Structures are given as structure tokens and as C-alpha cells.
From Swiss-Prot:
It comes from Tropheryma whipplei (strain Twist) (Whipple's bacillus). Pathway: Purine metabolism; IMP biosynthesis via de novo pathway; 5-amino-1-(5-phospho-D-ribosyl)imidazole-4-carboxamide from 5-amino-1-(5-phospho-D-ribosyl)imidazole-4-carboxylate: step 1/2. The lineage of its organism: Bacteria, Bacillati, Actinomycetota, Actinomycetes, Micrococcales. HAMAP family: SAICAR_synth. Coiled coil: none annotated. GO terms for molecular function: ATP binding; phosphoribosylaminoimidazolesuccinocarboxamide synthase activity. SUPFAM superfamilies: SAICAR synthase-like (SSF56104). GO terms for biological process: 'de novo' IMP biosynthetic process. CDD domains: SAICAR_synt_Sc. This is Phosphoribosylaminoimidazole-succinocarboxamide synthase. It is an enzyme of class 6 (ligase).
Length: 305
């Protein structure tokens, strides 16, 4: 079955050429300024590298707002055009319909570093699975005993491949071989600093950032934050009060403001193996869509309110 993807009409973006897209976003280049891109965030939802139906209402707008909020909060140079040329940004934005602009990021074109950089501050997800099996977190031995959801002694840098299918962990030594020691050290320091700063900001908002994914690009020899930043799709958020209540069931203590409920539902309804044949016919129930929508909406309000 072929799915119809949500893509803005060409008449709404006459100054832009569509050059590609992924599971949840579409990418455009400006017809005159070839070094300027527009990333459009759709309402599509994916799990296990498959796009599912139906879409989540307002998802693109909410995640774009989260990302832009963090780009302005963190003391980091990033790919946003408005930070580089405000006059050009205002001119380009003025020709984009508001219903598209609110879900779009206008940015400078960069050479994207072909890795994703995950920072883990708490023992959860694949880090917890690794700890249970090997008593390590991606090769790092932890001293003492830890429970699921515990704060780690310090943020752990765990890069992965950047793939259209399944991302796989990358050893630091292999990262050095791929991009050089200087860039590897710089990116590890940047990720650790950005995560530490963001986690403190989030804590002041009543939230915990358990882990987060960062992406970077290079322009004119400098490294910049790129892609989306600390959205509900690229970071794992918990409620700080629930996290601290150890008498609660673990699924309530570590209930995250993201699409984990979608992943759990797919696991339960796709049989033993998560394959295209098993996932494609699935249609997410409306109750689940509303649950995820409310999580995104609550997170956005907590962060920006």
C-alpha cells in the first residue's frame, strides 16, 4: 500500500524547490539563494523506521516550536539563518504562508557530519538494556549498583551511525578514524556541555532530560548545531516529580513526553517480528493519537510557559 505523504503545495512555496524528504520532514532549497534550506516538519509519526497512520495533529508545529525555543536558549552557534542574516531571513519568511512557516526552519546549508551524537544522563532505554546484560553502558564500567532510571555519574557520549534504517552504535575510536581526533574531541565536549546546560534549564521547568540526540554541520570550517534540537522526537523527557517517587510503578515514574506509547503499541500489535509486512497494515487507534498529542502539547507548555 502506498502512503500519500504530507508535502506543501508548490504554489505555497514558489521560491523553493523540493529536493527530498525523510520519514517526518521535507527539505527545500531556495531557487535564488542556493545555500539556504527550508525544513518542513510534517505531522507524520514513525516508529522502528516506518511511517504510521494516522498523523498526529499539530505535531510539526509543536516540534518546530520546541526546537526553535532551544536554539535560542542554548549558547551555541547553530544553522538558523536568522542568527546569520536577519534581514534576509525576514524577507524570505515574509513570502511563506503562516501555516507553513510555523512548521518550518529556514537555515544555512551545511555539510552535515554523518553521525548522530547521543548523550545519556540517565540509565534508560538501550543503556539500561546494555547495563543489565553487560554491567556496562556502551563499554563504560559503572561503579556501584544502579536501578532503571537512575542518574548516571556523568553524561555518557554515545555516537551512532546516521542511517535511513537502523542506527548502530559507533565506538569513539571509530569516530576518531572517521572525522579526526580534533573534531571528535570537540563534538564530545560540545554535546556534553549542551546537554548539561539543557538539563539544568529543563529541571527548572520541572522536567528531566534523560538522554538527547544532537546533530552538527560544518560551514566555512566551523561546527554548528543543526537539524532539530531537543524536541520530543530527539530527546527523552520525564516529569521530575514522578521520577523522584520510587513507590510508583516504573512505567509511571519514567513515563516520557514522546512517542514511546506508539512504539509500545506497535510492538504489541506487529507479532513477533517488526517487519514492513507486519507494520504497514497497522493503523494507530485514535485514543493513542490523542495520548501522544497531549504529551507533546504538555511538554511544549512546560518548556515555553
Amino acid at each position: 500500500m502506498t502512503r500519500k505523504l504530507e508535502i506543501p503545495e508548490s504554489r505555497d512555496l514558489p521560491d523553493w524547490s523540493h529536493i527530498g524528504g525523510g520519514k517526518v520532514r521535507e527539505l527545500y532549497v531556495h531557487r535564488q539563494y542556493k545555500n539556504i534550506l527550508l525544513m518542513f516538519a510534517s505531522n507524520r509519526v514513525s516508529a522502528f523506521d516506518f511511517v504510521l497512520e494516522p498523523e498526529i495533529p499539530e505535531k510539526g508545529r509543536m516540534l518546530t516550536q520546541m526546537s526553535n525555543w532551544w536554539f535560542r536558549k542554548l549558547p551555541a552557534e547553530n544553522h538558523l539563518l536568522e542568527n546569520y542574516d536577519q534581514e534576509l531571513y525576514r524577507d524570505l519568511a515574509s513570502h511563506i504562508p503562516s501555516h507553513i512557516l510555523e512548521r518550518s526552519t529556514i537555515c544555512r546549508k551545511m555539510d552535515i557530519i554523518p553521525f548522530e551524537f547521543v548523550i545519556r544522563g540517565y540509565l534508560t532505554g538501550s543503556a539500561w538494556a546494555d547495563y543489565l546484560e553487560n554491567n556496562t553502558v556502551y563499554g563504560i564500567k559503572l561503579k556501584g549498583k544502579f536501578r532503571q532510571g537512575d542518574r548516571l555519574p556523568g553524561p555518557i557520549f554515545t555516537p551512532t551511525t546516521k542511517s535511513r534504517t537502523k542506527d548502530t552504535p559507533v565506538r569513539y575510536e571509530d569516530l576518531v578514524n572517521a572525522i579526526g581526533l580534533s573534531h571528535a574531541q570537540q563534538l564530545r565536549e560540545m554535546c556534553t556541555d549542551y546537554y548539561t546546560t539543557a538539563e539544568q534549564i529543563a529541571r527548572n521547568k520541572g522536567l528531566i532530560i534523560a538522554d538527547a540526540k544532537f546533530e552538527f554541520g560544518i560551514a566555512e570550517g566551523k561546527v554548528y548545531l543543526a537539524d532539530e534540537l531537543l524536541t520530543a522526537d530527539s530527546a527523552r523527557y520525564w516529569d521530575i516529580n514522578s521520577w523522584g517517587q520510587f513507590d510508583l510503578p516504573i512505567e509511571r515514574r519514567l513515563d516520557s513526553f514522546d512517542k514511546q506509547a506508539v512504539r509500545d503499541w506497535v510492538k504489541c500489535n506487529s507479532g513477533k517480528n517488526i517487519t514492513p509486512q507486519n507494520i504497514t497494515p497497522l493503523r494507530l487507534p485514535q485514543e493513542l493519537i490523542q495520548t501522544v498529542y497531549k504529551k507533546y502539547k504538555t511538554l511544549l507548555a512546560k518548556l515555553t510557559g
